[in-house]
Structures are given as C-alpha cells and as structure tokens.
From Swiss-Prot:
The lineage of its organism: Bacteria, Pseudomonadati, Pseudomonadota, Gammaproteobacteria, Enterobacterales. Pathway: Amino-acid degradation; 4-aminobutanoate degradation. It is an enzyme of class 1 (oxidoreductase). Optimum pH is 8.2. Activity decreases sharply as the pH is raised above pH 9.2. It comes from Escherichia coli (strain K12). Its EC number is 1.2.1.16. This is Succinate semialdehyde dehydrogenase [NAD(P)+] Sad. The gene is sad. One of its GO terms (molecular function) is succinate-semialdehyde dehydrogenase (NADP+) activity.
Length: 462
C-alpha cells in the first residue's frame, strides 16, 4: 500500500528528515467506536463528585511527571522543540493539573442568589463530550490546558491531534490511562478532515474546541455553527511589541528576544511586530539584532541550543517566501533571511527593519523566527500601528510610565496586554483573542466555565 498524507498521518523528525511513524487515518468504524466509548464514558463520569475528579487530576499530574523525560524527548523528536523548552512544557502541564485540582472545585460551586425573596441558584453542569482539534507547536500543553478543566467539569474529551505529532498523542493517552482515567472520558482519534466533519455533526459531540490557523478555525467553526454547537477558537496572532522612548532598554531587548524566538518563533501569541518609538528605535534595533545573532541554533537535543528546526519543511518554505516578499516590498534585512543548507528544517533568527503596514511581514502572521521592526512617531502612532491588524491575541508595552501603559492597554484590541513583560499563558489568568484570533477563553475560571451548562435553578417562581 502506498503511504501518503491522504492515507496516513506521517511523523517526520524535523531535525533530520527521518520518518518516525505512520498511522492510517481513522475509518468510519473507528470513529463510531470512539463516539460510543465517549458517550458511555461521559454518562458515568458526569455522576462522579467534584472531589473525586480533582483527585484524578492530581493523579494525571503524577503520571505525567513519571514520564516527564520520555514526553520531553518525544516532543523534541517529533516537532523540534529545544529539549529544555520541551521539559519546561511538561513541567508546566503537570503543574496545571495540580492548580485546577486545588482551585477548580471552588470555581464549580453553585452560586445562590436572592431574587425577590425567592431562591435562585446558578449551577455549573457538565455539557457532554468535547471534540478538541489541537496543533503541533505545544503538543502537550495545548492538549492539557483544555482537557484538564474540561474533565474536571464532568465532561468527556476526545482529541484529534496534529498528524505530525502522533507519538505525542499516543503518549498523552498513556498518561491518562496511567492515572486511571476511565476509557471514553479521555480519548483520541487519528481523524482526517472528513472524520472531523463527521464527528462535529454527531449528536454525541456536545461542543468543539480548536487551536490552529485562521483558515482551519473558520472552517471548523462554520461546521460547529451549522450543527448549533458551541466552539472555542484559539487561532493565529501577529502580536505587537511596543517599546516607548522611556522604556528600560535592556529589559525590553531581553523580553523581545525571548518573546519572539521561543519555540523557534512558532507561537501564536509570540511578539511578531516590533513597534518602536523613534527616539529609542536605533538603540533598540542594534541591541536586538546583536542578541538575536547570539542565539545558538542546532540539534534540539543539545541543551546549549536555543533554537531548533521548524516543525515542517513546508512551513519553513512558506516563512521564507513571506520574508522574500517583504524584502521585495522595501524592507531591510538586518539578520538571517536564508534557508539553512543540509538536513533539517532550519531557519535562522531573522530581523527585518523598515517594515511598513502594507508589507507582508506586517499584515500576515509570521510563524517562525522572524522579527519585523516598525518605527512609530509617538505613543499614539504606536497604538494605531498595533491595532492595524486583523489579529487580536496579545500585545506588549514597554514603558516606565505605568499610567500611560494602562491607558494604552484599554485601547488595544486584543485578548491580553503585558506591561514590561512578554506574553505567556498561565493557569491563573484567561487566555484568548478577538478579531481573527478567535473567541472564547481558556484557563482560569473562564476556561473551566466555557464548557459547562450554566444552569439556573429557581425555586417558587410563580
């Protein structure tokens, strides 16, 4: 049988080009079996009490820590994340389990209120089995930050993972099995687009959550809407990183490099458009380029390397095409900008200057290690440039004037604003975007309540 992406999910080591695994797409019988298991699992799981479910989250965290190095190595092998960053992803995911186990039950308590001397209570009920379509860039964290609160709320979770990280998908499933999560409460399926469509239409799927591209999110969201099913979309970003004249330059440069080049730049909420007030632009650019040039890139298994390969060769080629288009439009290349020779999908830290709003690097998401620098005349101009985007995931402001920063934050069209620090997701705060970056929220109590039936129970209402 010929193996192609049309028939199989294919995992390829992005550092070497070695084929790691192939897995056939799920057929109709596989999908039906998964949905039957999910329906049965949900019926039983919804009847368990919240304290039991919280304790099972702790068990998931323990099981994940027991396989921490195995999981980190799998992440690095399948999608090229530098090993230290992969280990951090595993640790963060395990800590998420503990945080929701400790704080989640209180977030799901009934909320009584008095209504005209009568009793009304808001209850947080399970919704059903949630279909999750997840990406490859954080192959563990993206799954866990959805699955953990979804399962705590009494729902089931059915995963369709990205085809290039099937090893990660299998290992995550093993972690949940190790923790004693019943079959059907957590499940995964290697489904293609047709299989996803079939599941969205099925009555045993209650809702859908997607992390991915705008194109994928729009397509899946349309199908969920046609089926009248709730969905949460966490999509792309072209996040602005604003540096004003009074900023702490050293701190701003350090945060800018970390915010842009983490995970080899393959982060939806990474800083991508660097909007620098003209009085500090020259000094910032000089230091930023020097710091980016000092980053070590190479074998992601080597702990000394800060950047690894990009996850797929087609993604690297697309990124390079965007760079070439931006240069042809008049931008200036200060660093990088060339595909690396030899094995692996390597692309060097790249810095583009003189980027203006009509250019590709400003208008499109650059999903890789490319920074685009745009000069702003003043703070008001910086704000206008930041909002001049179809995306609205996060934004950063560097300034020593906190009052001005908070005033700007109120006018930024995005889901999260970070003052004197770069964007990161955290269990304690909501994460999500506006505009074409999607809708709905993950994490904190907002993420926990997204997939609850928020039910009003009103006594003596006549």
């Amino acid at each position: 049988m010929t193996i192609t992406p049309a028939t199989h999910a294919i995992s390829i080591n992005p550092a070497t080009g070695e084929q790691l695994s192939v897995l056939p797409w799920a057929g109709a019988d596989d999908i039906e079996n998964a949905l039957q298991l999910a329906a049965a699992g949900f019926r039983d799981w919804r009847e368990t009490n919240i304290d039991y479910r919280a304790e099972k989250l702790r068990d998931i965290g323990k099981a994940l820590r027991a396989r921490s190095e195995e999981m980190a190595q799998m992440i690095t092998r399948e999608m090229g994340k530098p090993i230290n960053q992969a280990r951090a992803e595993v640790a963060k995911s395990a800590n998420l389990c503990d945080w929701y186990a400790e704080h989640g039950p209180a977030m799901l308590k009934a909320e009584p209120t008095l209504v005209e001397n009568q009793q009304a209570v808001i209850e947080y009920r399970p919704l059903g089995t949630i279909l999750a379509i997840m990406p490859w860039n954080f192959p563990l964290w993206q799954v866990m930050r959805g699955a953990v609160p979804i399962i705590l709320a009494g729902n089931g979770y059915l995963l369709k993972h990205a085809p290039n990280v099937m090893g990660c998908a299998q290992l995550i499933a093993q972690v949940f099995k190790d923790a004693g999560i019943p079959q059907g409460v957590y499940g995964w399926l290697n489904a293609d687009n047709d299989g996803v469509s079939q599941m969205i239409k099925d009555s045993r799927i209650a809702a859908v959550t997607v992390t991915g591209s705008v194109r994928a999110g729009a397509a899946i969201g349309a199908q969920a809407g046609a089926a009248l099913k709730k969905c949460v979309l966490e999509l792309g970003g072209s996040d602005p990183f604003i540096v004003l004249n009074d900023a702490d330059l050293e701190l701003a440069v350090k945060a800018a490099v970390a915010g842009r080049y983490q995970n080899t730049g393959q982060v939806c909420a990474a800083a991508k458009r660097f909007i620098i007030e003209e009085g500090i632009a020259s000094a910032f650019t000089e230091r930023f380029v020097a710091a980016a040039a000092a980053l070590k890139m190479g074998d992601p298994r080597d702990e000394e390397n800060a950047l690894g390969p990009m996850a797929r060769f087609d993604l690297r080629d697309e990124l390079h095409h965007q760079v070439e288009k931006t240069l042809a439009q008049g931008a200036r290349l200060l660093l990088g900008g060339e595909k690396m020779a030899g094995a692996g999908n390597y692309y060097p830290p790249t810095v583009l200057a003189n980027v203006t709003p009509e250019m590709t690097a400003f208008r499109e998401e650059m999903f890789g290690p490319v920074a685009a620098i745009t000069i702003a005349k003043d703070a008001e101009h910086a704000l206008e440039l930041a909002n001049d985007s179809e995306f609205g995931l996060s934004a950063t402001i560097f300034t020593t004037d906190e009052t001005q920063a908070r005033q700007m934050a109120a006018r930024l069209e995005c889901g999260g604003v970070f003052i004197n620090g770069y964007c990161a997701s955290d269990a304690r705060v909501a994460f999500g975007g506006v505009k074409k970056s999607g809708f709905g929220r993950e994490l904190s109590h907002f993420g926990l309540h997204e997939f609850c039936n928020i039910q009003t129970v009103w006594k003596d209402r006549i």
